[in-house]
Structure formats: structure tokens, C-alpha cells
Amino acid sequence: MMSFFPLLLVGILFPAVQAKQLTKCALSHELNDLAGYRDITLPEWLCIIFHISGYDTQAIVKNSDHKEYGLFQINDKDFCESSTTVQSRNICDISCDKLLDDDLTDDIMCVKKILDIKGIDYWLAHKPLCSDKLEQWYCEAQ
């Protein structure tokens, strides 16, 4: 029983890495570099991200032929490289795992590439949910 105690102590003191659940206003601050890029406003981004990942940096959605990763749900078929997709185009030249961390710098760089190639319609939530009536997506700090 004594040999189990140190393991238990380590488990308590160093919990597993958990998803960073951001708030709307915290995320608004993190997305300053993206605001206005390709004429997409910050409230539009906050709305899109809420609907696709719930502001969860470690969100992964499994589809029939690919997975989508992180806040922006970037797919491993075209934009990032994962161990589960055999032939990713990896346009963003990034591991999908990097899209699950709390550093959004590389995520935003990839998002800009996606916008340049596919436009905002890459995010299916935009048109039906986030293209107008965006009052609720403004943060008081904006």
C-alpha cells in the first residue's frame, strides 16, 4: 500500500492537462490579430467559435473521413497533419496536436490561410448563425 501512495500524490499534485475553456471576453482579447482580417469582425469569430467548439481549445470532432481540431475546428484532411489521416495536404504545415494547446498564435496563422483559400464559408456555422444579429457576441471590453 505504501508504494501506491507516491503515485496517488503525483496524480493529485500534477493533474492531467485539461482543456482551456475560454470566456467570450478572454477569447476576444486573444483574437485581436484576427479582427478585421478579410472583413470578418470579432463578434462573428466569437459566434463561430462558440458554435463549433464551445470556446474549448481541445475540442476534437470526428467525421467520417477526417477530424477537426481546436477552437477553430481545423480539419486534418487539408490543413493539419494527424497520425490518423494518411494523406493530409497539411496546407498550414502544422501538427493537429498544436491546434489543441492554449497558444493561439499558430491557430490564427492557419485560420488566415484558410480564409485566403476557402473564405469564411469554410466554417459552416457562419452563414446561418453568425452573419447578422451579432449584438450578443460583443464583449464589454471591445
Curated annotation (Swiss-Prot):
Residues 1-19 form the signal peptide. One of its GO terms (cellular component) is protein-containing complex. PROSITE patterns: GLYCOSYL_HYDROL_F22_1 (PS00128), GLYCOSYL_HYDROL_F22_2 (PS51348). It is found in: Secreted. This is Alpha-lactalbumin. Belongs to the glycosyl hydrolase 22 family. Gene3D superfamilies: 1.10.530.10. Its main location: secreted. Pfam families: Lys (PF00062). Regulatory subunit of lactose synthase, changes the substrate specificity of galactosyltransferase in the mammary gland making glucose a good acceptor substrate for this enzyme. This enables LS to synthesize lactose, the major carbohydrate component of milk. In other tissues, galactosyltransferase transfers galactose onto the N-acetylglucosamine of the oligosaccharide chains in glycoproteins.
